[in-house]
Amino acid sequence: MRRACIIGASGVIGGELLRLLLGHNNVEVVCATSRRFAGEFIYRVHPNLRGFINLKFTQPSIDAVLKSESDVVFLALPHGESVKWVPKLVESGLLAIDLSADFRLKNPDDYVKWYHWPQPHPYPDLLKAAAYGLPELHRDEIKATKVIAVPGCMATASIVSLAPLVKGHLINNDFIVVDAKIASSGAGAEGTVLDYHWHRTHVVRPYQPVGHRHTAEIEQELSLLAGSQVNVAFTPHAVDMVRGIFVTGHARLSGSISEPDLWRAYRGMYGNERFIRIVKDKAGLAHYPSVKYVVGTNMVDVGFELDQRLNRVVVFSAIDNLIRGAAGQAIQSFNINQGFPEDEGLRFITPYPV
C-alpha cells in the first residue's frame, strides 16, 4: 500500500485525483492540501466524495507532507508553483508527480519563451531527470524516475494522434496543422469571466490561436520521435462541453502512402496498448473517434483518413481532459513507476447513453 498526498487538492484536477485514488487498491490518500479550504472537510468542496472520504484539507507545507509519511506526492498546482516543491520532495526521497507544466519542457530556456518566466528553469538537472509522463512513449523513463511531468491535456491528444505518422516518417514534418476543441473544465476552478456558463454555452470560440504553450510540448515530443525538428501550427477552441478534448490534425504525406501503410503504423505502435483504441470503422455508429465514448475513462481514441486527392492525411483523437489529460494519466504513470498493473484504479467504461 502506498500513502499519497495531493498538493492543491481543492481544484478540478485535485478533485479528480481524489476520486480516482479512492478507487485504487494500492493507495491510501493520507493528505490533501488547500490554502483556501484548510480545516474544511474534503466532501464539502467535492460533494461527489461525500461518504467516501472523511479527511480535512490541510495547509500546504513540506512539513505536513513529511508528517503524513507519504510515499508519493501529486502536485495539482498552477504553473510556476510546483518548481518550488519538487526539489524538496525529491531530496526527501519521495516520488513527485507534477500535473503542471513546470517539468515538461527539456530546454530550460523554453520556460522564458513559452511561460514567460523571468529566467530559465532554475533546476536544469532535475528537468533533465524528469520523465515526460506519456506512458505509451516513455514507459522506461517513467519506471526509473523520481519526477514525473504529466503532459498537458491538449498536448496528450495531439501527440498520440500524430506519433505513429511521425515515427514512421509517413508525413512531412515542416508544417503540421492541429485544431483542438476543449471543454470548460479545462479552465480549472478559477477560470475567467469567459468561462461563465452564459459565455460558454452554445459557443465555439478560438483562444490563443497562435503561440499556445502546449505547442512546445507537441513539437518537443514529435521531434524526439522524428529525430529532427517538427513544426506544428496549433489552435485551440473553447466549446460547449463540460469534459473532453477533440483534436483534428492535417499533414502532407511524405510520399506515395496507402491506407494499409497508415494502418500498419497505428497498429504497430498502439495495437497492444491498454488505453489507446483505433477507431476507423465503416460499420456501426462510431466511424471515427468521439468525445462521447471516452468521457469518464483514461482512453485515447484515435482515427485517420487518407486524402489521396491532396496527398494528405487527416487524424483525429478524443480524450477526457480531466482523466487521460490529467489525473488518469498521472495515475497510469504512477502505476508504471511502482510496478502495479497499468490499469489499476482506471478500469472504467464510459456510461452510455449520456
From Swiss-Prot:
One of its GO terms (molecular function) is NADP+ binding. GO terms for biological process: arginine biosynthetic process via ornithine; L-arginine biosynthetic process; lysine biosynthetic process via aminoadipic acid. Keywords: Amino-acid biosynthesis, Arginine biosynthesis, Cytoplasm, Lysine biosynthesis, NADP, Oxidoreductase. It holds the Pfam family Semialdhyde_dh. Its EC number is 1.2.1.103, 1.2.1.106. NADP(+) binds at residues 10-13, 34-36, 321. It catalyses: [amino-group carrier protein]-C-terminal-N-(1-carboxy-5-oxopentan-1-yl)-L-glutamine + phosphate + NADP(+) = [amino-group carrier protein]-C-terminal-N-(1-carboxy-5-phosphooxy-5-oxopentan-1-yl)-L-glutamine + NADPH + H(+); [amino-group carrier protein]-C-terminal-gamma-(L-glutamyl-5-semialdehyde)-L-glutamate + phosphate + NADP(+) = [amino-group carrier protein]-C-terminal-gamma-(5-phospho-L-glutamyl)-L-glutamate + NADPH + H(+). The keyword tRNA-binding does not apply. It is found in: Cytoplasm. NCBIfam families: argC (TIGR01850). This is Putative [LysW]-L-2-aminoadipate/[LysW]-L-glutamate phosphate reductase. It comes from Caldivirga maquilingensis (strain ATCC 700844 / DSM 13496 / JCM 10307 / IC-167).
